[in-house]
């Protein structure tokens, strides 16, 4: 299976198009957005399945720091002729600070009737229990947050 990982760590706007045009084509795509610097980070990912029996998995993980705005949109499009296709879209954004703004918008457009396609999305702050646990092991708050962020983006 073809695997692609792309990282974004500067403000900007990106569009990624993933065409699935060959019968049985398989691909995994992962996008990592490190938006700990202020600015606007916008990512759109579109997977278009036009061949039968294709398999995909799209994952976006983002960290949104204070003063940053992250907008992630993902779309899985499955054409009528792309029967027996499977794809999963996952968008996860971790917010750091009260001024971090983030949105995750997963979408499915399915014209075929023999497919497996789904999505998941979440936007939220660092889990306070995880922070307290790491701090009880001797880490300072900033170091604990950094440890959680590194694990989340890995």
Regions found by a protein language model. Give the residues of each.
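Conserved beta-strand/loop scaffold segments within soluble protein domains that form the structured core
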Residues: 1-139, 149-154
């Amino acid at each position: 299976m073809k695997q692609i990982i792309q990282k974004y760590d500067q403000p900007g706007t990106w569009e990624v198009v993933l065409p699935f045009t060959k019968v049985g084509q398989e691909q995994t795509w992962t996008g990592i957005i490190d938006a700990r610097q202020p600015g606007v980070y916008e990512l759109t990912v579109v997977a278009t399945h036009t061949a039968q029996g294709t398999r995909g998995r799209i994952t976006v993980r983002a960290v949104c720091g204070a003063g940053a705005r992250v907008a992630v949109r993902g779309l899985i499009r499955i054409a009528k002729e792309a029967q027996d296709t499977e794809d999963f879209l996952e968008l996860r954004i971790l917010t750091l600070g009260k001024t971090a703004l983030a949105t995750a918008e997963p979408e499915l457009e399915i014209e075929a009737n023999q497919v497996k396609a789904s999505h998941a999305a979440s936007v939220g702050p660092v889990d306070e229990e995880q922070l307290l646990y790491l701090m009880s092991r001797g880490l300072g708050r900033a170091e604990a947050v950094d440890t959680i962020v590194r694990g989340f983006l890995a």
